[in-house]
Amino acid sequence: MQKKTLSDITIQGKRILMRVDFNVPLNDEREITDDKRIVEALPSIRKILDNGGRLILMSHLGRPKGKVNPIFSLAPVAAKLSELIDTPVAMAEDCIGTEVMQSALALQDGEVMLLENLRFHPEEEANDPEFAKELAALGEMYVNDAFGTAHRAHASTEGITHFVPTAVAGYLIEKELMYLGKALEKPERPFVAILGGSKISGKIDVLENLFKKVDTVLIGGAMVFTFFKAMGLETGSSLVEDNKLELALSLLEQAKNRNIKLLLPQDVIAAPELSADAPFHAVSVKELEAGEMGLDIGPLTIEAYRQEILGARTILWNGPMGVFEIDSFANGTFAVAEAMALATAKGATTIIGGGDSAAAVAKAGLASKMTHISTGGGASLEFLEGKELPGIAALND
């Protein structure tokens, strides 16, 4: 997917309208608790400002449901960004309207303003053409650097591209496409995919698309129990999708037909209930008892998965191995993160597909040891499913 990027346009003296993903978590005092998404956008922001561009940033924050709600104002983000780039960031009162237009036209080279939350207007998520046209009028060129919303056809990601002469990808989207695209198109082999999470239903399309690309698939998380039940094993009170048993068998069959090594856990960590105080023990998947639930992969499985990871040249991970939020059931997820960090050090390309896996890697303190951590959970999942992302498809080739 070759798209024009920030490097292909002349920035000096131009009003550059850039869609970023500043949807950051805030606490009750409205302080930003994790500024990763702002930091991820800095390379594009700095490039535009250093080259004398006049930058207009736009983003959504939270789910204000199309109404103005001060709780979801981007003002704290403007303050944080200003601190990070050591430059004043003007905060607009709205994202469209005469006053906003006047402020945009008044920007000088190297100055930056942030528009107020796009989702204060229902037209944003409805991809309303009039709203998109009004946004487009603010800039002379459009840059999309919001990978996290690239799978949504919204006014600021897809609609806007119909009203601007130039629409290119920012550096973050370029980086996402480079790593995720290379993994799917020209991976160094062996290529191992690790899939976790609670439900097969959320990962069917990913599995079916990855079966065309990978050599080995390692499966963890509660979705293993749907496979086990389909295979006739006791699953106790573990989470099972009873309406997906046939599907589980067909996925196993597909893997076999394609000569893909698909590994399921040999043992799990079982407990009578999901709680931090519950007694737990490792048990073979063939010996799980009726009143028990499996909540993590066990030590034998960790070792087997570790060997596969360390023997790989490309590793893609999406979804935790267990309930890593509770220490008793976090070993599997952290062991996978550690094995991936080791594999990276040995020269493998390691890619984390956003969401819970990214949170787990951060919690393990290993984020800097991975080749690439995707910033978009839903967007990276759809990309891995082989779907076209509207926000990226709409950019200039």
UniProtKB/Swiss-Prot annotation:
The keyword Kinase applies. Pfam families: PGK. It comes from the Bacteria. Keywords: ATP-binding, Cytoplasm, Glycolysis, Kinase, Nucleotide-binding, Transferase. It is an enzyme of class 2 (transferase). InterPro entries: Phosphoglycerate_kinase (IPR001576), Phosphoglycerate_kinase_N (IPR015824), Phosphoglycerate_kinase_sf (IPR036043). It is found in: Cytoplasm. Pathway: Carbohydrate degradation; glycolysis; pyruvate from D-glyceraldehyde 3-phosphate: step 2/5. Its EC number is 2.7.2.3. Signal peptide: none annotated. It catalyses: (2R)-3-phosphoglycerate + ATP = (2R)-3-phospho-glyceroyl phosphate + ADP. ATP binds at K203, G294, E325, G354, G355, D356, S357. GO terms for biological process: gluconeogenesis; glycolytic process. SUPFAM superfamilies: Phosphoglycerate kinase. Substrate binds at D21, F22, N23, R37, H60, L61, G62, R63, R119, R152. PANTHER family: PHOSPHOGLYCERATE KINASE, PHOSPHOGLYCERATE KINASE 1, CHLOROPLASTIC-RELATED. Monomer. Belongs to the phosphoglycerate kinase family. This is Phosphoglycerate kinase. It comes from Chlorobium phaeovibrioides (strain DSM 265 / 1930).
